[in-house]
Amino acid sequence: MSQPSYFDAMGYEAMIAEYGRPETFVNEIARMPPDKLQKLQNERFLKVMAFAWKIPFYQRHWGAANLTPDDIRSIEDISKLPPYSKENLMASVEAYPPIGDFHGLDTYADNDRPPLVFQTTSGTTGRPQPLLYGPKSREIQNLLLARFYAMQGIRRDDVLHSVYGHGMVNGGHYVREAVLHWTGAQLLTAGTGIETRSANQVSLMKDFGATAIIGFGDYITYLAGVARKEGLE
């Protein structure tokens, strides 16, 4: 038996039926009556908890707090769950190199294991933390970001200029996926000033009619200064 492809494992039709497209969230889900929304949140929370209890990291972390699955019966019990830190995750990586034991891969049979998207944190505070995404969790992340963009008014006829980087960090990659997979807008993946020179970024925005820019505020402010130097307002 061959392993499932990314798109098969993602389950696009089922995902759309369950979560809706970004415009569905803005027009329907965000306006859902509180009791109906709480019921939906509770169902999804319990589903996530059932999966998490199969993962050694959470078994160990919650077990240390004397919790059992029977202690968490609804989303109202979420305050019983002890928080965990990056230090906890990196301790897992140290004990179970190279990716730790918090990812849930061992819950799948070899032939059913989905493809993975692998990223890391930036490592600015130490060793980079591995970030692993299965197809469905990856696309749900992308969809959540696309909802955020939709709520800010991004539509299919927009041209977005992104200055998020595209190294091992997740930033620019999931921004690109969110925009292309879920908004229908045109994306200029310029990246950082190292990837595309700042003067070239300004030219790209002018030539292709960028209607919005996404990224870190300090660099966007810097690009505004570059644009003025280039005679663009």
Residue ranges of model-derived segments:
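Nucleotide 5′-phosphate-binding alpha/beta core
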Residues: M1-T120, R127-I140, M151, D207
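Conserved adenylate-forming
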Residues: S2, F7, K47, F51-K54, ...
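Conserved S/T- and glycine-rich ATP-binding loop of Class I adenylate-forming
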Residues: A52, T121-T124, L160, I213
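Conserved AMP-binding loop of ANL adenylate-forming enzymes
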Residues: A146-W182
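Short glycine-enriched loops at secondary-structure junctions
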Residues: P115, R138, G165-V169, D218
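Conserved ATP-dependent adenylate/AMP-binding module captured primarily in the ANL superfamily
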Residues: S79, Q141-V159, T196-G209
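Small/polar loops that bind or transfer phosphate-bearing groups
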Residues: Y133, V163-Y164, G215
